[in-house]
């Protein structure tokens, strides 16, 4: 029934739009925090970190949680979406990013690093794709996170089995283009899904490099914890296969309050104004 409703483009849903989002950072404060991250980067304390801010609004009384999910779902074509409705909290995820897939004892991870907004003009859009592919800054971000994830899955994979299958490949969605890499490995004997998640959470693409220090910087500068955002949503089968996303582009509804985080990776040649705009483009 939900599948059929996802295909409906009903006027009722289109009319029930949720607006008036308020960030927990002003633009100036967001930029100042990026400048502080740049100080850490320039001192060699970190090489990259993922910095985000949170938008909050009150849910309109005439909107059900399902309507909110469907309304956004009409506007996205992301492959790793999820709708989780519990008694006290609802999670509507429109993630384009696979975190971990396990099939036949093979581990697959596909980090996203590098984003540019799409254009409805085809010629201009081709130029934007070219700009993204040739961006040294975005490629540097992608390469660093590939190294982080290679290291993470090497802890639970057979020696010599970890391979980069795709490096900084363009993947296009309705509103943005991304640079996506894919790393694979063969799991060691006596390793299960929980071991894999323990070795890889939180995802390298939403923390930074080196991972632990990047997480400390995030904890210092972000005003609130991320909740499910940037964690993992997925399933584990009886055969021990699994598939998890990283819940970016994710709406959380709690006590009739809607929140959505957005941000991006910061490296030494990041431009604070551009980073702020990229975070907005992802909403």
Task: Please tell me what each predicted stretch does.
Residues 1-6, 10-283:
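Extended alpha-helical targeting/anchoring segments
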């Amino acid at each position: 029934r939900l599948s059929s409703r996802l295909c409906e483009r009903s006027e009722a849903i289109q009319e029930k739009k949720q607006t008036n989002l308020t960030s927990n950072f002003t633009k100036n404060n967001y930029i100042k925090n990026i400048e502080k991250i740049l100080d850490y980067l320039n001192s060699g304390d970190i090489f990259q970190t993922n910095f985000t801010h949170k938008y909050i609004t009150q849910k309109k009384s005439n909107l059900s949680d399902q309507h909110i999910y469907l309304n956004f779902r009409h506007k996205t074509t992301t492959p790793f979406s999820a709708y989780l409705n519990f008694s006290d909290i609802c999670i509507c995820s429109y993630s384009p990013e696979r975190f971990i897939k396990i099939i036949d004892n093979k581990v697959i991870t596909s980090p996203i690093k590098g984003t540019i907004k799409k254009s409805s003009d085809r010629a201009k859009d081709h130029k934007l794709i070219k700009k993204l592919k040739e961006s040294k800054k975005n490629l540097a971000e992608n390469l660093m996170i590939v190294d982080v994830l290679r290291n993470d899955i090497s802890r639970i994979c057979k020696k010599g089995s970890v391979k980069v299958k795709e490096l900084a490949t363009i993947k296009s969605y309705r509103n943005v283009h991304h640079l996506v890499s894919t790393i694979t490995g063969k799991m060691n004997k006596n390793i299960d899904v929980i071991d894999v998640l323990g070795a890889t959470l939180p995802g390298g693409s939403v923390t930074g490099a080196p991972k632990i220090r990047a997480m400390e910087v995030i904890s210092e500068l972000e005003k609130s914890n991320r909740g499910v955002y940037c964690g993992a949503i997925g399933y584990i089968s009886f055969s021990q296969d699994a598939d998890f996303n990283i819940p970016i582009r994710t709406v959380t509804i709690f006590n009739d309050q809607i929140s959505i985080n957005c941000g991006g990776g910061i490296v030494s040649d990041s431009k604070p104004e551009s980073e702020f705009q990229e975070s907005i483009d992802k909403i």
